[in-house]
Amino acid sequence: MTPVREIGTWDVLFFLVFLWLLSKLVGRLGRRGRTTPLRGPANKSLFFGLTRYLNESDDPGAIYESWAAEYGPAFRVPSVLGSHRIMICDAKAIAHFYSKETFGYVQTPMTRISIKNIVGRGLLWSEGESHKRQRKALSPAFSNAAIRRLTSVFFDSSYKMKAAWDSILETNPDNSVIDVQKWMNHISLDSIGIAGFSHDFGSLDGKHSDVAAVFDSFGSTKPSYFAIVVFLLAQIFPILLNLPTNRILLINKLKKTMGDIADELLERTRKEKEGETGAVEEKSIIGLLIKAESAEAELRMSQDEVLAQMNVLILAGYETTSISLTWALIELSKRPEKQAKLREELLSQFTSTDPTWEQLTNGLPYLDSVVHEVLRLHPPIGELFRMAAEDDMMPLSTPLVTLSGQTVSSIAIGKGTVVGVPIRCMNRSEVLWGKDAKEFRPERWLEPGFGENNEVQGHRHLLTFVDGPRMCLGKGFALTEFKAALSVLIRNYTFEFPGPGGAVPKIEKHRSILPRPKVEGQDGAKVPLRVRRVE
């Protein structure tokens, strides 16, 4: 009689893994059965699908646009290990998608783990009623009245940078090359520190900041091949995001550093509030967070949620605005005539004073056009992915032909299907923005009838701030900071590339927390420009 082998731990583990993979396969087949079969590009890799190809491209938006032209406004893209994603490039479908955010379409497991690992379980991480509660509690800090009060903070930070640059230019007025990206990082960090938390990180004064040092380390290191593979496979196995790759170790360090700072600032503010020193405004960001800790059940936030909100604000304040300011200086250095035109508008009204919030918002049309053209061409986040939480029927403004040859004006989306919006593609689409959609041309925003035929919803027909319940809460804050800083820079300095005759170098994508521009051949995410004073 053959002896019976005792079942060991590894047997149980392999059996559980087999069952898990089987359930995933059955679920995937079920989703495919409930989702309209769409056409799409051929697979390039059984292992990575087209994910690695898109991830390594300097312009995935152009790739998505070419696929939309070939396969229609919604198409299927092969992903990791035989999975697929549905990409939508149709204005009506995108409006429907965003309207159902946080309930009908939710963040993918990979996205939620990524957000939790970086900032914690706050507004970015939450869904449904929890998201609605947290957003409602924070909204007063981003009202027009609140941002109007903060405008002077943005100008103060800009002038601190000007003082530092003037010192640099004193030593070499005609040949000063400055890494502008580093300084845009510092102005953004100091602005969010003072505006949000009444705390000066002091990075513009050369003061060491732990959080700035960790952020800078993302800009100076490249992810390892192993880290890239882990990131790609995490779309199917999100638990891989807990592996100690060089990138994930940096993320852990960033979260701890931001958490320590946030904890310290909260504790200081609580003591000020208890002492009734008057230093804490209830409608400031940190004041509202303190208030939310002890609020009634409807708006109450846990301590973990409060810390997560502060982490989000530090991260968003540092990353997004600094990237946009850097792109603005790149585009204006490429086109000195547009730089001069912007300077003329600013100096014709403001030589010894600064614009008010109202003037920044409505009184400087060319500045507004430059800012929105930068945000159109260079959104900090290029694609947005969500997972269907329920079966859905998505309407289309343009009919498409399915894989079976049927013409349809709506598509079925099965529960569990990952759906993506290619933001960069939509912002640069020739169908929506005209034949010169890929060009930096701020004048388009000033033309009569501009945008009348653009069906895309969202701020000024842009998807940069997304739309619906998850539209960027800090949109007004970011726009005002962007305009204030750029107005000071352009009024006081001229910018050009430092090569012979101002030759424009190739601008590459550097993988940081968010993709950043970098000049080809530079170490890390550096953008050196020749800076001269305006005489």
UniProtKB/Swiss-Prot annotation:
It is an enzyme of class 1 (oxidoreductase). Belongs to the cytochrome P450 family. Its EC number is 1.-.-.-. One of its GO terms (cellular component) is membrane. Heme binds at C472. InterPro entries: Cyt_P450, Cyt_P450_E_grp-I, Cyt_P450_sf, Cytochrome_P450_monoxygenase. It comes from the Eukaryota. GO terms for molecular function: heme binding; iron ion binding; monooxygenase activity; oxidoreductase activity, acting on paired donors, with incorporation or reduction of molecular oxygen. The keyword Cell inner membrane does not apply. Pathway: Secondary metabolite biosynthesis; terpenoid biosynthesis. SUPFAM superfamilies: Cytochrome P450. It comes from Ampulloclitocybe clavipes (Club foot). It is found in: Membrane. Its cofactor is heme. Pfam families: p450 (PF00067). Its main location: membrane. It is a multi-pass membrane protein. Cytochrome P450 monooxygenase; part of the gene cluster that mediates the biosynthesis of clavilactone A, a meroterpenoid that features a unique benzo-fused ten-membered carbocyclic ring unit with an alpha,beta-epoxy-gamma-lactone moiety, forming an intriguing 10/5/3 tricyclic nested skeleton. Cytochrome P450 monooxygenases claO, claP, claQ, claU, and claW are close orthologs, suggesting that a redundant function or pseudogenes are present in the cla cluster. These monoxygenases are not involved in clavilactone A biosynthesis nor its modification. This is Cytochrome P450 monooxygenase claQ. Keywords: Heme, Iron, Membrane, Metal-binding, Monooxygenase, Oxidoreductase, Transmembrane, Transmembrane helix.
